[in-house]
Amino acid sequence: MSRNQGQHPVAAIDLGATSGRVVIGELVDGKVELTLVHRFANGPVPLVEFDSGASAQALAWDIDELWSQIRQGLQMAFELRPDIASIGVDSWAVDYALLKEGQRLGQVRHYRDPRNELAVPDLEAKFSRAELFERNGLQFLAFNTIYQLQAEKQEQRLGEADQLLLVPDYINWLLTGQARCEWTNASTTGLLNQRSGTWDEELVGQLGVAGKLAPIIHPGDSVGSLLPELAREFGASNSVQVVAAASHDTASAVAATPLAGKNSAYISCGTWGLVGVELAEPVLTEQAQAAGFTNELGLDGSVRFLKNVTGTFLLSESVSYWNQQAAQASEPEVQLADLLAQAARLPVPLVLIDPQDEAFLAPGRMPVRISEAINKAGGTAPEGRAELIRIVIESLAASFAAQAHEAARLGGFDLEDIHIVGGGSQGELLCQRTADLARVPVVAGPVECTALGNVLVQLRSLPQGADQVDDLRAVVRRSVFLRDYQPVGVLKPA
């Protein structure tokens, strides 16, 4: 195989809610090849670990540890490929860093922090949910940035801050010293007006961030050059550019989802399940708001009309709980793959759970809470772990199928197929049951869709790559294995 003439590799920093990674991507024989260089853990940390006076329930991200891991990963990447031309960053949405005179104020708070729920009534006393949806087109979620900022107004640091940067923009700032806000992620904050594509001045003023938001840039724009001191640390040239990826991880994932056509839905399945369709214009109807859908911005001016639903969080939290028990009892670790294999042999459960139930929002004791929900619904709590996993899988598949059809209906077309990407696309039982319940084919893959989208946007932005990566999805189809699942009929409960 030969590398494309004149094409340099790029580095993608892909930060997820449970893990992060640094990946090298390059074009080889017209296909994108990804090399995982560094993977590291991520997750919520009690704020009290950083601030002894904080509430015991308050949650944060260890952003300094993430930055340390990113630097380590980039050093490894440049050791492997000194000719890396650019770096791009994507991450989860809504969370932010506050800065004053170039110094971060406190920690980056976690979107699952319970303070957000308490702030909802205060903001809605000024703007109704219907009015907010008309402005920003977003599904109501208590962790949206606007509610976090309303909660922040009760604390000192927002008034002291002179800059607010969303997580990927903060990492870009650390890399370049340039403060910019990439627009796919800006659209998740609730502060961006869907009709104008600019900051909503009234909301911005009401929430105390006037003059604190960075200029908006678009995917593929240059953020700036890598800082000289970091270039020396990584062994990189001074010409390395930091390029704005579609910095909301879902936007990067959707950019790399090889949709079959305009009547396709996508499910970006990780900790969250982002179920939606790609449209040219936002859907700002009462029906869309009532159904809980959101309008987020995507690559090349597209609209990601989608609904945030629970994804594999219920599975990972259940396994985490069981492994805590196993450690206390000096027993072997529980492996999700083993439980999924056992679950596939079990019948369709009689009683399902609602994965969107607020009882499942916070981490901790997940199997206990699932069992309680099943009892409350009139069912019998599962006796074994595999049985509980089977209930979760069936519940997720039912949720995915229903929301994919609803997205298509509200978008004005009949659903023809579903593409599942991300880590959840590896779950054979989940993909098959989604196809069965939706009664349409499911195409699974790619797994590393977010990193792939990040890489493709960067490659397209480079002068030598502009004509080679014009159709991102065609490149994806050439580059990865996709698995098809045909619906086989809805099985009746045993």
Residue spans for each PLM region:
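N-terminal glycine/serine-rich phosphate-binding loop of ATP-dependent small-molecule kinases
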Residues: 1-106, 134, 160, 215, ...
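Short alpha-helix plus adjacent loop in nuclease-associated cores
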Residues: 109-128
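Glycine-rich beta-strand-to-loop/alpha-helix junction loops that act as flexible
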Residues: 90-94, 219-220, 269-272, 417-425
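Active-site core segments that coordinate phosphate-bearing ligands/cofactors
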Residues: 2-5, 11-12, 24, 124-136, ...
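A charged helix-plus-loop insertion that forms the helical arch/lid used to bind
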Residues: 103-115, 188-191
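Enzymes and membrane/adaptor proteins characterized by extended Gly/Ser/Thr/Asp/Glu-rich
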Residues: 177-186
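Core-facing hydrophobic residues within beta-strands of well-ordered domains
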Residues: 84, 211-213, 415
